[in-house]
Design a protein with these regions (language model features):
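Extracellular loop-to-transmembrane helix junctions
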Residues: 13-16, 43-68, 82, 86-87, ...
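Transmembrane alpha-helical segments of multi-pass small-molecule transport proteins
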Residues: 98-99, 123-146, 162-171, 335-349, ...
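Hydrophobic transmembrane alpha-helices that form the core helical bundles
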Residues: 72, 76, 94-125, 133-137, ...
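Loop-to-transmembrane helix boundary motifs in multi-pass membrane proteins
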Residues: 91, 130-135, 246, 250, ...
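Membrane-interface loop-to-helix entry segments
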Residues: 135, 144-174, 370, 375, ...
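Hydrophobic alpha-helical segments and their helix-loop junctions in multi-pass secondary transporters
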Residues: 161-188, 204-219, 381-390, 415-425
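Flexible loop linkers connecting adjacent transmembrane helices
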Residues: 2-5, 40-43, 68-93, 118-120, ...
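Extracellular/periplasmic helix-exit of transmembrane alpha-helices
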Residues: 62-76, 217-225, 249-279
Length: 425
């Protein structure tokens, strides 16, 4: 059956609209499935089987709601979160936000660098992992200084397509459909340290605080780069929400299938504790055979190279906006020296964590747990800003946004308090 010219035009228009709408939200969603996320979800599947599948249905609306608030703040104020707080709130709140964000982001950078080093060693065993970590750190720093981030992201996001392999693998394996439906729609909760650690790590690596800053700043820069002053209306808000929802859906879809894949392949193979990247890569063996290591390595390297600039960039934006310095990944080095020096410092600090003796796998999970413990404070700040009419004008939260925001705050705070309680008592 041939397609009529009018139909072709309609399809082209829809595709153009689709590509136009996809922006910061899609990059945010893709970078959320970073090495820390991949390993955390893999650990959840290996340790608990399918018991945490239901968390994807919980985190998608919560993650989308928080990221939408951050994006709306950036659109309306033309500033990132730190810049908005600096203009409208007290400095102690700004410093509190920096205090909660800095260690978690640096640890995440270090864990991702270690993860990239480990998979590099997986491909070339003759070279120690630290060699790859150093090489990738230098490569990233050079790329971020000399190339606009959007060019880097547009190239690297194709490597992240490898993650879609996780969606295929479960269909090559004999599945208990009843168990999948049960664990997807009926929450399983156990009040023990191991379960709560995994739950906090899943929440922390999915609803990651660094993405709050990134989303707001990227939307603000989109506004600043326009030749004409942007009038934020319903159409602009609707397109922004489309972008956010698509990006967050992709992120949570991949996370769901990573748990399903590892909860089937690794858990049923009695691999319940992932200590090495080789073990994590085993989940792809049913589809890829001996190429499983290559696919896993490409996925981790691609997501790591996509996410680390987002992490270090987020930290640089926070510090630059806190102290009123000029900054931005669209600027050249001589235009924003302090901004790029902070990025370099964060990479060096992250790399130095490789020398303290924590295994890359554990570091990736620890980073996710730390995010889970610090996120409630930052969600509270985002909620306050997005409900402040002096800041947001007529674009404050509706009741749905507030309901989802408060639910995210309560769920993450409860999981974090439960984990601390178990650890202490």
């Amino acid at each position: 059956m041939s397609i009529k010219p009018k139909q072709r035009k309609s399809i082209r228009q829809r595709l153009r609209h689709f590509s136009k709408v996809l922006g910061p939200g899609l990059i945010t969603g893709a970078s959320d499935d970073d090495p820390s996320g991949i390993v955390t979800y893999s650990q959840a599947g290996a340790t608990l089987g399918l018991a945490t599948l239901w968390t994807a249905l919980l985190t998608f609306p919560l993650m989308a709601a928080i990221q939408e608030m951050c994006a709306r703040i950036g659109l309306v104020t033309s500033h990132g979160l730190a810049g908005t707080i600096r203009q409208h709130y007290s400095k102690p709140l700004l410093y509190l936000m920096l205090l909660f964000s800095f260690p978690a982001i640096v640890m995440n950078i270090g864990a991702d660098i270690a993860g990239i080093g480990a998979v590099g060693n997986l491909l070339v065993p003759s070279l120690p992992p630290i060699y790859f970590s150093v090489i990738f750190t230098i490569l990233l720093l050079v790329l971020m200084i000399y190339l606009p981030y959007r060019k880097i992201a547009n190239g690297l996001k194709y490597l992240c397509v490898v993650l879609l392999v996780y969606i295929i693998v479960p269909f090559l394996y004999k599945q208990d459909i009843g168990a999948i439906f049960q664990h997807t729609f009926i929450p399983t909760i156990r009040l023990d340290k191991d379960f709560l650690s995994i739950l906090v790590a899943i929440l922390g690596t999915t609803i990651s605080p660094y993405l709050f800053f990134w989303q707001a700043t990227m939307e603000a820069e989109e506004v600043q780069h326009r030749k004409k002053k942007l009038v934020v209306d319903r159409k602009i808000i609707f397109e922004m929400r489309e972008d956010i929802d698509i990006g967050m859906f992709f992120s949570n879809l991949v996370f769901y299938f990573i748990i399903l894949t590892t909860g089937t392949v690794l858990y049923n193979s009695h691999i319940h504790q992932i200590d090495t990247v080789e073990q994590a890569a085993q989940a792809l063996r049913p589809m890829a055979g001996d190429a499983a290591y290559l696919l896993f390595a490409l996925g981790v390297i691609g997501t790591g190279l996509l996410a680390i600039p987002v992490l270090s960039g987020s930290l640089s934006y926070i510090v630059s906006e806190t102290f009123g310095w000029s900054g931005g990944l669209d600027k050249k080095f001589h235009e924003a020296r302090a901004f790029y020096l902070i990025m370099a410092l964060s990479l060096v600090l992250g790399l130095s964590l490789n020398y303290i003796g924590i295994s890359p796998i554990k570091a990736l999970v620890y980073a996710a747990i730390l995010y889970g413990l610090t996120a409630p404070v930052l969600i509270g700040i985002v909620m306050h800003i997005s409900n402040n009419k002096k800041v947001m004008g007529q674009h404050t939260n509706g009741w749905v946004s507030n309901a989802l925001g408060f639910l995210a705050l309560i769920v993450m705070a409860a999981a974090g308090i439960g984990l601390i309680w178990m650890a202490v008592f």
